[in-house]
Amino acid sequence: MVSQGGGLSQGSIEENIDVEHLATMPLVSDFLNVLGTTLGQWSLSTTFAFKRLTTKKHSSDISVEAQKESVARGPVENISQSVAQPIRRRWVQDKKPVTYSLKDVASHDMPQDCWIIIKEKVYDVSTFAEQHPGGTVINTYFGRDATDVFSTFHASTSWKILQNFYIGNLVREEPTLELLKEYRELRALFLREQLFKSSKSYYLFKTLINVSIVATSIAIISLYKSYRAVLLSASLMGLFIQQCGWLSHDFLHHQVFETRWLNDVVGYVVGNVVLGFSVSWWKTKHNLHHAAPNECDQKYTPIDEDIDTLPIIAWSKDLLATVESKTMLRVLQYQHLFFLVLLTFARASWLFWSAAFTLRPELTLGEKLLERGTMALHYIWFNSVAFYLLPGWKPVVWMVVSELMSGFLLGYVFVLSHNGMEVYNTSKDFVNAQIASTRDIKAGVFNDWFTGGLNRQIEHHLFPTMPRHNLNKISPHVETLCKKHGLVYEDVSMASGTYRVLKTLKDVADAASHQQLAAS
């Protein structure tokens, strides 16, 4: 059980099922392979689209289903061949494990020569990185210990594929950080306590609430045609879009159903059809954010696209220092004044980039049909509601207000979670990276509902597949872990979070003013 003080009252990580060993047992893995082939065949081409459509700068989806599909089925020849015949298998050739130090592994951090560490074992993924179903997000952990990010985002069947790239064992000069050990023990404890299991009735209730919101919005303009009614209906539609955004987020993190392909199906319905954004585009962007929140490279070029907002917004003085244009500096001097207004255009930006994603020539015909077809259904129902029920220019007013309202409601919650927190260009372990870059907003009936559970953003980043209704249960244990290891657990009111975001923007704006004067 979980102790009140946030520690472990019994058991440890060693007492749990070893998923790595389980996944490599022939009987179990064969069963999982057959099951995955039967239930999830449809999503493989979409999974591999994520990999092909990423660049070295912008990494891709590290979603659980992508890893599961790559292990469970082998219809893609280049993947199966590379897994079957990896270049390096030193442990087989030498008949005994080779040992490596952290320094040895760190020297192999290039796309053509890349090693990673997972559970004290070293893997040479040089021949696999380009074919990684999750895309180039794997690049962010070249030469590093990827134990926690791998365990957090991958299905148990993904352990099987690792065995083909095993080249030896890690020998540490120093022991693993106690922080990481205790984080792993907490994760094992939460697994035993069934906290990764979702309440289907909870999600049914959330769905019904959303249906009632959209039904009310449509009913208002069905009965009344005044501009007051149009504005009220549009505002409710914006709220509906925001709340459906949280639902799609839950499904696409595989929080709801135990079967990953079913989460994906519902995620596509809510994401593409209801909301009109490309799920593939979103995963490409969002899962990299989870792997490298607020992280930049050595030159302070953002790795996390969520902070790649120049030339309009600069989230730190280090990012500001990369700006050379005097015109940009003049704009940035006022970023704290126009920022909240800018949030209203967030959804329009996401719709634009989603549409642009579907035009990429790398997409196969099937991928184009899936993305464009489901997104087209969104525009059909959304425009039909507006133009069928409203006369004159009122449909345009209704749609514009809906988009602006939903953009603000979504964007406002997002910026509270990470903006105004540390932006860094140094290597951090998984746990330190999540906590340093993330802020919680205090729990409460309204906050929990309005933010879709993302007010517990620290907990979500540490355990992204945990259903939102369990995040408040684990927050005392996460806070205890942070305090024990001297980490700042930022848990503030919504007003305080807003103030901290705006203060950061103002501080950077002042620095932009000084920088512009110095350049004159």
Swiss-Prot record:
Keywords: Fatty acid biosynthesis, Fatty acid metabolism, Heme, Iron, Lipid biosynthesis, Lipid metabolism, Membrane, Metal-binding, Oxidoreductase, Transmembrane, Transmembrane helix. One of its GO terms (biological process) is unsaturated fatty acid biosynthetic process. Its EC number is 1.14.19.47. It is an enzyme of class 1 (oxidoreductase). It catalyses: (9Z,12Z,15Z)-octadecatrienoyl-containing glycerolipid + 2 Fe(II)-[cytochrome b5] + O2 + 2 H(+) = (6Z,9Z,12Z,15Z)-octadecatetraenoyl-containing glycerolipid + 2 Fe(III)-[cytochrome b5] + 2 H2O; a (9Z,12Z)-octadecadienoyl-containing glycerolipid + 2 Fe(II)-[cytochrome b5] + O2 + 2 H(+) = (6Z,9Z,12Z)-octadecatrienoyl-containing glycerolipid + 2 Fe(III)-[cytochrome b5] + 2 H2O. Fatty acid desaturase able to introduce a delta(6)-double bond into delta(9)-unsaturated fatty-acid substrates. Has a strong preference for linoleic acid (18:2(9Z,12Z)). The histidine box domains may contain the active site and/or be involved in metal ion binding. This is Acyl-lipid (9-3)-desaturase. It comes from Ceratodon purpureus (Fire moss). The lineage of its organism: Eukaryota, Viridiplantae, Streptophyta, Embryophyta, Bryophyta.
